[in-house]
Amino acid sequence: MLTPTRVNKIIDIVAKDYPQIKNKPIKVTIQKGKEAWTCATSNSDYELLISKVYDLEIGNNSRFAEMFLPYMDDTFKLDLTWFLADFQSALDAVVLIHELGHVIQTSEINFKKGNNWMNYARKMNAAYEDYREECFENNYNYLERAIAYRQIPYEYESDRIASEMFNKYAVRLISIISGKTQKELKTIREEKMYELQEA
């Protein structure tokens, strides 16, 4: 379960590889019953809007997870074995770091220089508009739309960062979110992997 304190611990871990994530303060807001997790930015700070858990019972979240995890495995070799230790906490970690990936991508833009920010915003808006046009013109179903969305450069880069950080720090991330010890999680993972091999 995510709390502002736990999120800030995860930000500290990510900052070891991406120190620019600390360029501006990140305000963490825990929202209730929301499907979308977002990261908004201003001249002075970021606001991360997340939920206590990435709730698979809300909206399209369950369908999204069914697409997202195989996609992340195929595209970035996300280590899915850690999902055996604690599925919910592992999913929360990956989706959270995806949002932090958006912070990392914008962290070095000088917002006080309008041209820098406007150029970035124009490119980003054009990429999302291309995605919407592609979906409309091809009459994509949910799965096709979801896959196309992941190919938007800003989403793709955040997915890459999420996979990289999760694969490197999985047991620590899951431990922070779940409250279980790293030893417990490693044991659960090993037992589940053994069960799968024996099945």
Please identify what each model-predicted range represents.
Residues 4-22:
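Zn2+-dependent metallopeptidase catalytic core
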Residues 5, 129-199:
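Long, well-structured alpha-helical subdomains associated
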Residues 9-13, 99, 123, 127, ...:
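Charge-rich, solvent-exposed alpha-helical interaction surfaces
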Residues 21, 26-44:
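Amphipathic, interaction-prone secondary-structure segments
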Residues 38-90, 100-107:
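Active-site scaffold of zinc-dependent metalloenzymes
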Residues 90-91, 106-146:
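Post-HEXXH active-site segment of zinc metalloproteases
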Residues 104-117, 164-176:
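Substrate-binding/catalytic groove segments of enzymes
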